Every structure is written in structure tokens, then in C-alpha cells.
């Protein structure tokens, strides 16, 4: 499918021992820095537009830097930021490089707290100023805050408006920056609360500072800050005084995992990242529950605390279908089941002619679902063989057994993805010609005009790649029929929690439904839905419902599929094409513990999601449909 930009990746490490401990046990005081690099590289799939890292050095002397940050843009950002950090060590002697005490006192990025972030922009904004972590500085260590996260907030407009009403003038319009300012303000209040308490105990000077740093409660800061936000998020932060936290949204939309022992506390967006980096079993890695925060105090005391009541069970199902790496043991099985569950509709599509059907997949994220599909067809053929043998009225001969048992699933590597072709040629026909060559095929892999070709993808969003590249190149093999299978259901609604698909008109399913309404003289339903959405937008977001769902009600999945085929069929192509989508029921059966399916069903977990969906339909009508 078209590559989707999606939620970012986070990584955090808190060392619980002095640097000398890691030098002695692991041969380097850079243990955490090296592990952070591995954690970020293992999550490169989550962000290729930029990366950043930050470090806090505990116990730094006044006049010496204790917070360090590097950020960079581009696909090589991870290598670049670690290259910059390591450049500080290139002129050291071997003795200095092995001296943890020297490193602690003199070197940048020789600290106890580390944070990393990989960025994918889903807002269209670019520039180094949008790359995490964001940093808020102050002369008081406890008031310094470094923030990063995997999130998209739906109510930034409302919060921005509230801030400007108060007389504030935020320098950058982004959810991260606004969160940084809000959280920084609440952190200031928390520090001042402890300052007052210390003064009441008649403390003076550095005794007050030490008291503040020992008694700051980040849970108070999170409770007063995060209640204002609507969206899916994992928010991570470190303070100059040594507090560390990671909080997950109360709907459980975005994922976070952690591990702790007597040496380290670590956080990542995906479980296998921690397993591989720290050689752990899956059972040793804990999932951060919705509405809770992992908190590590300056003294290393670690706890998980509830910040907000859980508001739902809406973990993103797209994480399991597409975004997360398939190396997670549960995700691997779920993706296989998504493929296996599609056997019956595929059989129907090829008229049960398995002997003359070749199976393949669109590289690369559909590979695991493909294995599941093959497994399902192997089971189907085995059952067919058993039934054939059982129905014989005699003991089968060797030749008969060979004929029956000789049936097998014909799987081939049909599609190959070449290097990503840049659309630097602006003239339309040339660009289309370039796009058509993103994929290549294995010539001679099917029997022309005899074999059906079944090819599975993880999902179909816009349909652009199908129309401009995949269908054209597959047609060169001259199959009898092409069946394109999606392991995900039809994507019908926008996402506002971190996936780059916020406009209805981008979805081939939505465009097909609108076209069907036009062809059947049902335009009144479009206008009624428009008026209904405007009426909903006049209400508080907490009271809004989603009228956009009515657009799809007149049609079956098959009717929409047929219209999509008609719309995406390349000019001049005559080979029969059929689409097969996963059902909602099949999705829930394969992925029972991740119930966030708003892009398929229109059931948004937060009020802000429903509001923005209504706004998206209004925008479509006013900016596209009525034009």
C-alpha cells in the first residue's frame, strides 16, 4: 500500500547505578548511550523525518552544563545525532575514555538519564524546530523540562485559543510546544509549592534547592496538565533535577512498554525493541496501562502511578496491522490470523479453482499476513485431500494417491519493490510513468490467461499505488483474474491520533461511496449529512455524534468494492479485478485486545476525534464537492 506516515517512536533509559558500575561490568560508561542508539535504530520504522536525543547529568556543579540535546532532520538523523554526541570523545586518550569519573565531570552526554525520539510528521510541518525533544530552560534545575512524545492532540486549537485569551503568545503552533509550555508552567507551580514548604521549615539557600529536588512530584504536574488534552499520546519527559516520566493516554490509543531491574529503567514504543536491546523474554517487558505514568524520581525510586482514570479500551488496531514491527510474538500471530481468515472470500473470488491460482503479496509489510493466508490454504487443501480419499469406494492405488496428494498451494514471489522513485519530474504523464515502475514482477511465474493471481496487502487507503503501479505491472503477467486482498477492513474514516490520513477525500472507499450516491441519484443524502455535520459542530464536542457513517449505509461492502475497482482500473486494462477486504468481525477475532477501529467503523474513542471527523466532511463538501 502507499506508505503512511504515522506515530513516532520514543526511547528512554534511566541508569540506577554510578557510571563506574557500567564501566566495570560492561566495559564502558557509555552503556546507556549505546543502548539508546540501538533502541532508536530498532524503531526506525516509526520515524524517518527526524530524530533527537537528550541527556541529563545528575549532580552537576554550577557553571557546568548538565542537560544536553542533539536534533537532526532526514532519514539519517539517528546516525547524525549520535555522530555529533560521539564527536565529543574522539580526541580523548584511551585512559580518559575508560575513566568514568572523568567522563561524569567533564564530558557531554555522560549522564544518567537519556531520552530519544524518532519523528514522522502527520501535520505537514517541517523544520528542526519541530523535531523532538523540546527543551524549556531555567536557572533552577528542577524547572528545566525536556519533552518528547508519540502523539497527536485533537484539541490544540482550543488550548491555543485559551492561552491567547490569557494574554500568552506561544512562539510555535504545535501540540508539543503548547504541551511543553503548559507542563512547564505546572512544573513551575510544583517547584514553588515546595519552595514555600521549605521556607516554612526555615530552610535557606541550597537546602531549599535540595528539598525542592527531593520533593517535586511529577504526578502532580501530569495530573494538572494532561487533563486538558484530547488525543492519543505517550508523553515522555526528563527534568534538569533528574525526574523521568512516561505517560500513556487514558484511552490506551498509543502504545508504550517498559522494563526495570536494579540497573536500569527503560521505555520504548514497541516490546521487541526492549527484548532485543536488553536480551529479555516477552513476559519480562511490561505494558504501560492507559492513564498511568511510569515515574522515576531523582533518587532512582521507580513507580507506576495512575494519573487519569481509564476512559476506554481503544488501543490502535493499525499498530497491529501495519505500524509496529512484526517481530513481536503477538503481532506476528495476529497478522497471520488476519491472512488466514480471508480463505473463504478468496476461494469464492477464484471460483474455488485453487489448482489454477498463484498466491503472492505486496512487499513488504503484508508478508506475515501472506504466511497466514498460505497456512489457511494448506489446511483447506489437506481437508479436501482427506475428503477425496474418504469418498473413494476402494483402497486407492499408488497412482490415485499421487494424483490426490499432488495438489499444493502455488505460492510465488510475484512483486518486487524497487528503490523509492522521487517525484522530481513535475509533468503529469512523466510522473505517472515513474510511479508505475516502483514495483516489478517475476516474469514467467504464472501461466498467462490460465492462472488467477491472488495478491495480499496489509491495507488499501488511497488506492494511488494500486492504480498507478501495482495493477499495471501485474497485468503484464496476463493473469486470468487479479484478486487484490486487504488484510485490513475498508478504511472509511480519518485518523486524528497520529496517522497521516486526515482527509476523507483521500480514501478510495469514501470516493467510491460518493460516486455511487451520485450515480443512484441519492445526492440528497450527501447534503443531509453535510447539514447534520454542521449541526453537530454547533454542539460541545462531548455531545457530538458521527453522521458521516450514513454515507456508507445504502451500500454493501461488495458494491463499494466493485466501484473502487472501476475507479482504480488503469486505462486500457481488461483483466478482471476483484477486491477482498477483511471484515470488521474478522479484525476483532484476530486482534481482540486492540479495539481501536475508528478508521474502519467511525467510532472515535475521544470527543475530539468525532468533532474533527465532522469538520472533515464539512471541509470536503465546501472545498471539493461544491466546487
Protein language model features and the residues they cover:
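PRPP-dependent phosphoribosyltransferase catalytic core
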Residues: 226, 241-243, 248, 260, ...
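Phosphate/ATP-binding catalytic cores across multiple sugar-kinase/actin-like superfamilies
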Residues: 228-231, 334-355, 368, 373-376, ...
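Extended, hydrophobic alpha-helical segments in both membrane/secreted and soluble proteins
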Residues: 359, 366-373, 377, 411, ...
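Amphipathic alpha-helical
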Residues: 197-216, 377-393, 400-414, 420
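Active-site proximal loops enriched in glycine and acidic residues that flank catalytic Cys/His/Asp
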Residues: 237, 248-249, 269-271, 298, ...
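Terminal amphipathic helices with adjacent charged low-complexity linkers/tails
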Residues: 300-316, 361-395
